[in-house]
Regions:
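Glycine-rich, aromatic-flanked loop segments that form ligand/cofactor-binding clefts
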Residues: 70-72, 77-109, 233-251, 292-317, ...
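Conserved, mostly hydrophobic/aromatic
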Residues: 18, 157, 281, 327, ...
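Aromatic-lined carbohydrate-binding/catalytic grooves of carbohydrate-active enzymes
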Residues: 318-455, 468
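Active-site neighborhood of glycoside hydrolase catalytic domains
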Residues: 385-387, 425-580, 594, 599, ...
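C-terminal beta-strand-rich structural cap/linker in extracellular carbohydrate-active enzymes
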Residues: 695-723
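Carbohydrate-binding surface patches
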Residues: 235, 637-679
Length: 723
């Protein structure tokens, strides 16, 4: 069984064939984290012997050493001097809790979370631990789900007010793990607009370290993920303990190293600017967190997260399907287009084997620049005299699918919607509004706003008979205040916004099950498992420069699979960086994502169009392997100027290897690149050259990479097993 309970020892053992996660009740009251790692039969060591420090007995604030015990649901105020998972302000103003074991339940399957995205789990098994503070009546349900086929534990917490007076949550995290600080380093993903998810590894030191967002979105600046390991951890060797979060709003991911070298790792909703009132009988559900253990380094960790996402988080028609090759008109035309120009671009796209034409920003209201019309999702008849329906009919008539851009969460001050409902935006009455990109944020905590968005977006999708939607969000939140909440509940706005967003996404994606949805947030500003639950892919970054995309996509692959990464071939010089890279390189890098084009095809010479046609044929033939193969990082752009990665089929009979140089250097010899994931006993043929290599040879000696000729040269190899 995946979950075993020993009543004599009061031990819960969550397990599959590869991992164990063990919880022990101490004194019959406190759930203690005893072990997490490689599969074991049992742990007999006494956690009390290990965690008691006799020299500090005189300073203990509790009958048990809560300040040193590795707790599953720690709280501050009754002996533990570290920050905890939960903080509840009670009617008398105090916040101390003494959460003690009350009961437990072991369930087949994995319950869904009401109002929140979560991983499916028909084959999983779930432990629910119920704890209670007798003084206040606050009760907690800790849920742990273990899967048979992936080395991930899904966790969440539900808080219930069973008392007689209202209480206020001021912190409610999703997961906490106390680990021995043999994990000497922390890896996170940080960045900014146009350089999202850069890999940052730092030594763990006493005190707090981690990543967070206070922006109302998971953000360009941080990703809700962190990984702990020894300093000897590599991509393929060493133990890694990682936490990630299925949530799209402000978050907090933190490791605190205490005076005893215990590392407390926690992740969940950002406590800053958060509170939530629970009246008697009310409950609060936290987002879901994922705890991943890998004995095979960071690559092993990534593949577990990729399997979690692909098998259990993404949903719908496109979760495991090939994706249409698209061209997006944004960098081809920006706001300056008409129907004739769009049809010219679409006709050219059809000629080179593209499947989907996407109309980006500027089709609605009177939006000739970015300072108007958001919220007015009505056709601009100046640009589209036949409306969306007329354009869509013509695009479909060419044999292409038709896609459309929206930014439904935003409102322009210069819009009919704002003139009719100025109170619908997030704002503080009496204060000057702070615009970003000339826009304000709609208040998704309000039912009437959510209903308007669902109806307006659905109507436009139906008019345009769309096959694809790009759902954008180009600014973060500030000036936090909702006219729909009283003064005592304003700190609920951030989370209520995200709950409102999820309600909208559930409604729209359910209404249009055959439409491919791609999320976007000024590029990769909301790239998280929460959005993946509703939309199987996300625009990875607004930066389409191939060399910078190597870093962005390499970092993104730490947590998210190739099938989620929106990646396009764009024009040169690149519109964000001014850099020029070869077409073959731009294509090779875009094949590390969902693949598409973001340029004016009508301006390209015949030779480039012919090359694009050949590339599209190649991508379509290889797409199942590229999107859904086992992904391995081989050479890090964060450790030099070169990047390499590969995808291997599940049966290990086929692989695609990509290597990208940085700026060329003189007098360099060809490189040897050791591969991963192949069958050591098989022979593999390079489809292009016809050369045959042994799998063991490729994984030890390596594959020869030709020396660079020109800056940013890419080389790809398609390897197929020889029968």
């Amino acid at each position: 069984m995946p979950i075993l309970y020993s009543p004599e020892n009061q031990v819960f053992h969550l397990q599959n064939d590869r991992i164990s996660y063990i919880i022990r009740l101490v004194a019959g009251k406190y759930p203690i984290h005893q072990y997490w790692g490689k599969k074991v039969r049992a742990i007999h060591a006494d956690v009390m012997e290990r965690c008691c420090n006799q020299r500090e007995e005189g300073f203990t604030l509790h009958e048990l050493p809560l300040d040193t015990l590795p707790q599953e649901c720690p709280v501050f105020g009754c002996g533990d001097m570290r920050q905890g998972m939960l903080e509840v302000r009670q009617a008398d103003g105090s916040s101390a809790l003494d959460l003690c074991y009350e009961s437990h339940e072991i369930l087949k399957g994995k319950p869904a979370l009401k109002g929140l995205p979560s991983a499916r789990g028909e084959e999983a098994e779930t432990l629910v631990l119920r704890l209670r503070d007798e003084h206040s009546g606050v009760a907690v349900e800790l849920s742990y789900s273990v899967y048979p086929d992936i080395d991930v534990i899904a966790r969440n917490m539900r808080v219930v007010n069973d008392g007689e007076q209202a209480v206020v949550l001021e912190r409610a995290l999703s997961a906490c793990v106390d680990l021995e600080n043999t994990h000497a380093q922390l890896t996170t993903l940080s960045g900014a607009w146009a350089r999202e998810r850069q890999i940052v590894t730092r030594p763990l030191v006493p005190g707090h370290q981690g990543v967070e967002s206070v922006r109302g979105a998971s953000s360009h600046q941080a990703c809700p993920f962190m990984a702990l390991g020894k300093s000897t951890v590599t991509e393929d060797e060493g133990e890694v303990y990682a936490l990630s979060l299925c949530y799209s709003g402000s978050f907090w991911a933190d490791v605190f190293v205490d005076c005893n070298d215990m590392a407390r790792a926690q992740i969940g909703i950002q406590p800053f600017q958060f509170s939530w009132e629970l009246k008697p009988g009310d409950s609060f559900q936290t987002p879901e967190a994922y705890l991943c253990y890998s004995a095979n380094g960071l690559n092993g960790m990534s593949r577990e997260f990729h399997h979690l996402c692909g098998r259990y988080i993404t949903r719908g028609k496109y979760a495991h399907a090939s994706r249409p090759l698209l061209v997006n008109n944004w960098e081809a035309t920006y706001f300056d287009f008409n129907e004739d120009k769009l049809l010219e671009l679409a006709a050219c796209a059809k000629e080179v084997g593209i499947d989907l034409f996407v109309l980006d920003d500027g089709w609605f209201g009177h939006r000739d620049v970015d300072n108007s019309s958001l919220g007015d999702w009505v056709d601009d008849r100046r640009k589209l005299p036949n409306g969306l329906q007329g354009l869509s009919d013509k695009i479909h008539g060419l044999g292409l699918k038709f896609g459309l851009w929206f930014e439904p969460e935003m409102i322009s001050p210069d819009s009919d919607l704002y003139r009719a409902h100025p109170d619908w935006c997030i704002h503080i009455p009496g204060r000057m509004q702070v615009e970003s990109r000339h826009q304000l944020v709609l208040d998704l905590s309000r039912k009437e706003v959510r209903e308007y968005i669902i109806d307006a977006v659905s109507a436009a999708m139906e008019r345009g008979n769309v096959d694809y939607v790009k759902w954008d969000m180009n600014r973060n939140m500030n000036m936090l205040h909702s006219d729909g909440l009283d003064s005592a509940h304003q700190k609920e706005l951030n989370h209520r916004y995200i709950l409102g967003l999820y309600e909208i996404l559930e409604a729209v994606t359910s209404r249009f099950p055959d439409v491919l949805f791609e999320s976007c947030a000024g590029g990769g500003g909301r790239f998280d498992f929460g959005m993946m639950h509703y939309m199987p892919q996300a625009w990875c970054s607004d930066d389409t420069d191939a060399f910078m995309r190597c870093r962005i996509q390499y970092g993104t692959s730490m947590v998210f699979p190739v099938s989620t990464m929106g990646a396009h071939v764009s024009a040169v010089p690149n519109h964000q960086m001014g850099r020029s890279t070869p077409l073959a390189t731009r294509a090779a890098v875009a094949m590390g994502g969902t693949y598409g084009y973001e340029l004016d095809l009508t301006r390209l010479p015949k030779e480039e169009l012919d090359e694009i046609r050949r590339l599209n044929e190649k991508v379509k033939a290889l797409q199942p392997l590229l999107l859904y193969g086992e992904f391995y990082r081989l050479c890090s752009p964060f450790e030099g100027s070169k990047t390499a990665f590969m995808s291997v089929s599940e049966d290990r009979r086929e692989a695609v290897v990509t290597h990208v140089y940085g700026p060329a250097e003189p007098n360099r010899q060809p490189l040897l690149l050791p591969l991963r994931g192949l069958d050591a006993e098989k022979e593999y043929r390079d489809v292009e050259s016809g050369r045959v290599y042994g799998g063991d040879e490729l994984m030890t000696h390596g594959l020869t990479i030709p020396r660079a000729w020109g800056d940013y040269m890419a080389t790809q190899f398609h390897l197929v097993a020889v029968d």
